[in-house]
């Protein structure tokens, strides 16, 4: 499949169709997220780092977490390490014996953000078909994986 039709429009390349729709959704959702984060007093990077820690069960070896954080946020190892260290110094994470974990203050902040996003977006999510959401998430994950594989080896060597 190299072309697609959207809402009766002429056929356009699949990448262009996906890029336009994802770009529009990202712009709108990023602005809404920024509002919630501002109300919570958090940065986007802090929020994303706390979300990534959730994937690790709220604790991980520091080096493994920094590598994972760098990969997911597309940061070099130095920047990912600086981000992790700043979260420790802010009291949102704790570091002990090379294990980094979410601190109670971080858990409270993440929950406040989660509630804010949930309250704001609930009317939108309620209108979506769960099967469509599942397909969209699966497709975007696959696109992300395939696109990451296109990066030069040197770019991926963090």
Model-derived features with residue positions:
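Short alpha-helix boundary/capping elements
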Residues: 57-58, 91-92, 144
